[in-house]
């Protein structure tokens, strides 16, 4: 390499380094304890000023560090269970029996969903049952505090920063408020959507309404490649859409198995 080429490379490397450093200076600094959370909120709000509304930034500043969220995030062990153990822990037989009853009781709803999105009742009911026990357990953690805490936490800061930006947009749209409560990671509604999924796949209205949540869930699966009339067991075309719902293999297999039993397959 010539000296000129070497100098160019060195100069380019310095520019890249300085740009990266500038980005680090501007960005709110993550942390793994509560001590830096208030300062992080102020930095985040300052960065977002001009892009987020005063109302949504006020909602952000009203959040508190969620120890319940951090505890839940550090303690996720059920996904390490075998499929049989996981189904026993989640109450698989109850989900199937209740799911079959709800399918019959709401036949018109599920028929309309399948007609629109191509997704049958079984996997939707399996998801609904596993996520919230068919709406019975939707969580009691402040949603904005949960998402802000995980955006601040260093483990998955980038992912949850996206979720926090989506949550602030939902505040502007009147879908979330400072009082909204849900699961420990910021999921809301009957099928536990994170804020970005609410933005991308919500079909209108609150996901605390079961029909709205089920339509949104079917929309999510369709957007992830669900093919009308194709199978959804492992190795079949629609299993990939189920994989988009949850990254844990045991959870994916549970949805497929319970869904097929609810559908009577």
Which positions does each model-derived feature cover?
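Catalytic glycan-binding domains that act on GlcNAc-containing polysaccharides
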Residues: 52-265
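N-terminal mature-domain "stem" immediately C-terminal to a signal peptide or N-terminal signal-anchor/transmembrane
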Residues: 29-63
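Sec/Tat signal peptide C-region and signal peptidase I cleavage site
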Residues: 23-27
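Bacterial N-terminal signal peptides
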Residues: 12-22
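Bacterial N-terminal signal peptides that target proteins for export
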Residues: 2-13
């Amino acid at each position: 390499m010539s000296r000129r080429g070497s100098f160019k490379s060195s100069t380019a490397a310095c520019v890249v380094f300085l740009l990266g450093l500038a980005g680090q200076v501007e960005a709110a600094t993550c942390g793994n304890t509560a001590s830096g959370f208030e300062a992080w909120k102020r930095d985040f709000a300052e960065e977002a000023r001009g892009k987020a509304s005063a109302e949504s930034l006020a909602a952000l500043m009203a959040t508190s560090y969620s120890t319940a969220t951090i505890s839940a995030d550090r303690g996720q062990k059920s996904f390490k269970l075998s499929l049989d153990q996981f189904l026993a822990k989640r109450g698989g037989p109850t989900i199937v029996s209740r799911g079959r009853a709800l399918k019959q009781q709401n036949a018109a709803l599920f028929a309309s969903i399948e007609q629109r999105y191509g997704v049958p009742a079984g996997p939707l009911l399996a998801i609904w049952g596993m996520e919230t026990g068919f709406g019975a357990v939707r969580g009691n953690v402040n949603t904005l505090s949960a998402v802000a805490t995980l955006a601040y936490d260093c483990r998955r800061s980038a992912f949850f920063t996206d979720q926090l930006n989506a949550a602030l947009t939902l505040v502007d749209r009147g879908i979330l408020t400072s009082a909204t409560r849900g699961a420990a990671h910021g999921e809301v509604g009957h099928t536990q959507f994170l804020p970005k999924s609410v933005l991308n796949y919500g079909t209108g209205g609150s996901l605390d309404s079961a029909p709205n949540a089920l339509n949104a869930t079917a929309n999510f699966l369709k957007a992830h490649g669900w093919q009308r009339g194709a199978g959804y067991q492992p190795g079949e075309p629609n299993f990939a859409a189920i994989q988009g719902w949850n990254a844990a293999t045991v959870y994916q297999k549970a949805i497929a198995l319970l869904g097929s039993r609810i559908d009577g397959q």
